[in-house]
Amino acid sequence: HLSEQLGHEVSIRELARGEHTVLTAPITVACASSGNHGRAVAAGARHFGCQAVIYVPGDTLEARAKAVESEGAKVVRHSGTYDDAVRDVETTARDEGWVVISDTSWPGYEDIPKTVMTGYTVMAAEALEQMIALDAPRPTHVIIQGGVGGVAAATCGYLAETLPDDYPT
């Protein structure tokens, strides 16, 4: 988004220093989440000077919604399911000019989820690096939280590419 506006790649360092606050302040990022992803999007928005609107499904625990709010986001409690919230945030974001930051894709919206999932692979890479540093045996199994499947899919994909001959189940 900013890179397109500025005509050059914007670094995390530039954003963290607040070098583009004039441009980031009017940006609103949004997503549907029942907790962790929404909290991370809200924290990132706060850190980079953006606004965040997080749609939470009706069955989201109040403590999780409060945790998202604690990062400075506006929380919109949706009466429906997670999938309903995803559809509504996409529609509202399009109407309002917000940027959706989701790890769930749909036709025509693949780039940001791909980037989010690439970011998830950092956890798998760090875990594997620690195992190697400790001279630990390669993992035979991986157990990871499910959520909507983004972290699990990214982890499995990373391990399949990194350990093609010794892939854990």
Placement of each model-derived feature along the sequence:
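Short Gly/Thr/Asp-enriched flexible loops that form oxyanion-binding sites at enzyme active sites
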Residues: 1, 41-44, 48, 152-163
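Short, structurally constrained coil/turn elements
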Residues: 23, 94, 163-165
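A structural micro-motif
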Residues: 27, 50, 73, 98, ...
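Small/polar-residue-rich loop-to-helix segments that shape phosphate-bearing ligand pockets
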Residues: 53-141
